[in-house]
C-alpha cells in the first residue's frame, strides 16, 4: 500500500490541489495528520474534500480550536483572528466532523499517525 500523508492543510485549497496534482497516481490511500483547518480561506471546501477522500484523519490543535474543543487564547494575534473567522464560517456538519476527529496516535497498517507527536497531539 502506498500512502499519501497530508498534514497541516490549514484550509488552503490551492496548496492542497497542488500537492494532489504532484502526487497523482503515486498513492493508493490518503491519510491526514491533522490541522485540516486554521489560517486558510477555504475551511468548508477543504473539510468537505477531506471528509469525502481521506478515510483516516487525526485531529490537530487548529481543528480543536476552530471547532471550539480547545481554547485558542495562547495563539498569536493572527491565529486568534483566523480561529474566530473559521469557527464562524464552518458549516454545522463540518464543525461536527472536526469535533469528532480522533486524537492520535491512530494505528494504520503497522504504523501510527499523530499530530504533534505520539506522546502528545500538541507537542
Q: Language-model segments: what does each one mean?
A:
Residues 2-99:
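Core catalytic region of metal-dependent phosphoesterases/phosphodiesterases
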Residues 1-4, 106-112:
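Beta-strand-turn-beta hairpins that frame and shape the catalytic cleft
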Residues 10, 105, 120:
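Residue-level detector of flexible, active-site-proximal loop/helix-junction positions
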Residues 56, 102, 111-113:
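Structural preference for beta-strand elements that scaffold enzyme active sites
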Residues 61-63, 102-104, 117-118:
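Short, flexible active-site-adjacent loop segments at beta-strand->alpha-helix junctions, enriched
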Residues 97-109:
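Short, charged beta->alpha transition segments
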Residues 74-81, 111-123:
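Active-site-proximal segments of metal-dependent phosphoesterases and phosphodiesterases across multiple
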